[in-house]
Structures are given as C-alpha cells and as structure tokens.
Amino acid sequence: MQESGLKPILWKNKELILLDQRVLPGTTSYITAKTLEDCIFAIREMVVRGAPAIAITGAFGITLYWNSLVSKPSFSELKLKLSELLESRPTAVNLRLAIEEFSSRFPESNYSSFSLEEIQKGAEELALFMLSEDLENNLTLSKYALSLFPKQPSSLNIITHCNTGALATAGHGTALGVIRSLRDAGHSLTVFADETRPYLQGARLTAWELQEEKIQSFLITDNMAGWVMSSRKIDAVIVGADRIASNGDTANKIGTYPLAIVAKHHGVPFYVAATAKSMDFRIPNGSYIPIEMRKEEEITSFGFLKDSDGKPLLKEGVIAPKGMKALNPSFDVTPASLITGIITEKGIVSPVTEENLKKIFQSI
C-alpha cells in the first residue's frame, strides 16, 4: 500500500513549512512558520486544516515557542500560550489531545525540575512522533477498510465529503486515504466529491488530490448527493471526523449529517474513517461537542478566499443582499444511529455503540 507523495507539513532547519491550502488548486506555495503565533494564524485562517494536520501543526507550534526562549516562562505564562493555541480551532479534539500530551510530559507538579533544554528537546520529539504516528495510523486504518469491499477488483462508486486526504493529515489521509488504498488494491473507482460549501474544501482540495492521483471523479454540489444515490448504485459514503463522542456521535464538516440521512434512506453504507486521536470518551454524546462558528462573509461573498498576500483569489463579489445575516457553523454532528461503521487503526467498529467503541479502544 503506497502513501501519497504529497507532504503538506515539513519540519526543516527548526522551522515549520506548510503547504498553503488557501491558494489551492490555482497555486502551490508554502509558508514558513517561525513562531507559535505563526502556527495559530495558520490554523485559524486555514492555511492548514483537517483535525490531524491541525494537531501536528499545534505540536510544532509549541516546539517553536520553546525554541524561541532563552529562559523558562512561569507555568501560568505557559498555560496562557497553550490556551491561545487551543482556541484557534475548538471543535476537533486532536489539537486538545496534542496539548494535553505535552502538558502530561511536563506537568505543573514538577515543572521546575525540567531545564529549558529538556523541554525544548521533548517538545520537538513529541511533534515529530505525532507526524510519523499519524501517517502510520492512516495506512493501518486503510488496510482494515479493504475488508469492507470485495476482495476481487471491482467497480466501486463512492461519495465523500470535505477533504480527508494527504492535505488534512501527515500525508496519506483518512477517508480519502481509504479511497486511495482501494485504488491501489486494484478496484476501479468513481468518486463523487461534494464541493463542501462554504469553504469549498471538496472543490478546491479533494478534487485536486483526486486529479493528482488520477482517480476518476466527479465534483458535485452538496445538495446533489440524493440525486446521485437515486440515479446510480453507490457502494459507500466515506467521510472523516473531527471528534467522536463516547456513543459514536460524530462531528465532521458541515453537511455530513444530511449526507448520512440521505445515505440511510437509500440503503447506502455510511462509514467514518478516523484515528483514535479523534475519539473523546470524556463526552457522552454529540450534544457536548462545541461547534465552531465562522465568519458570515464565507456565506455571503466570495472575497473570503485570499492568497498569501491577502488578495482575493476570486473576483470580489457579493452573493447575498447587503445586510443579510448568515449562519456559518463549520461542523455538524451525525448521530451514531446513521453510521454503519467507524474505520480506525484499531479495527472497524460496527455497529457503532459506546460498548463497541470502548472495546476496541480499551487501551486509550
């Protein structure tokens, strides 16, 4: 099974180099993050996006913060910096877990016993481990996913939503990684990629990755999924996850929930592909997941997509009457009852229940 050659996150000469996903597919350019503040900006402004990639960027942001110091800050100062990082994108649990992992290695109870050099080294080791671990876990969950489909090469039609490929992870992908692995296993694929309004991750990023991989695909608007399922045989819907509650309720990019409802109506298997880092056993169900609300202009205009110099990528224009208010939740929650199975690096959870999730993740 081959990993994607695309590397959206690079650590080189003690600097973090990020593929600027705001300017894809028209331009391929990288930005260099030299400070924690640079990483927070990159996360908040979606230079980098996707729960795993956000967490990895955050871990390197912590490394950059420590590397910038000549003396240790007070623990209260450190907590403030970590809090600022956590607030950059609140819905995905992966970033919080990365911060908690760092904090567990250098806890307040014996913070004074660690030297500046020890923390600098430990922070970098953690970030590098997260980078390699995510890639390995993505490849492993993709192997498990193959068991859900015919062993013999077949023609498969799959719908996916948002972007869950190399761009959203350390380099292979979750849901899109599964699709890539199905292709590598000899299946003939046709992928229907939702454009994913309003930020167009499907149109700009998933479509680009599919073309790069030479996988036959069609871009569809989010509200075409029902027509596609009713007019041809769809073998599966495969999506990613930003946070999965104890009972299996799953937060993912806005538009996932109605896609699951339509899949249920048409009898199409609906799979979530995610690593253990997206599990949150501290919350009982999806109602406890905070939903990030983004800027109204992402709904009412085209000007929100900007290049690295802050210039609009598309011709500036308003698509709603002046003064029109808009709601812009970045995520919705799909109830576990609509999910056929959750594909993880530990195995496949099906049916999706709290008992089955805890059974497979008992080591967490």
Swiss-Prot record:
Top enzyme class: isomerase
Catalytic activity: 5-(methylsulfanyl)-alpha-D-ribose 1-phosphate = 5-(methylsulfanyl)-D-ribulose 1-phosphate
Annotated site (Transition state stabilizer): C162
Pathway(s) annotated for this protein in UniProt: Amino-acid biosynthesis; L-methionine biosynthesis via salvage pathway; L-methionine from S-methyl-5-thio-alpha-D-ribose 1-phosphate: step 1/6
Disulfide bonds: none
Pfam families noted in UniProt: IF-2B
Any one of the GO BP annotations: L-methionine salvage from methylthioadenosine
List of catalytic residues: D242 (proton donor)
Protein origin, superkingdom: Bacteria
Protein family according to the UniProt entry: Belongs to the eIF-2B alpha/beta/delta subunits family. MtnA subfamily.
Name this polypeptide is given: Methylthioribose-1-phosphate isomerase
Species lineage: Bacteria, Pseudomonadati, Spirochaetota, Spirochaetia, Leptospirales
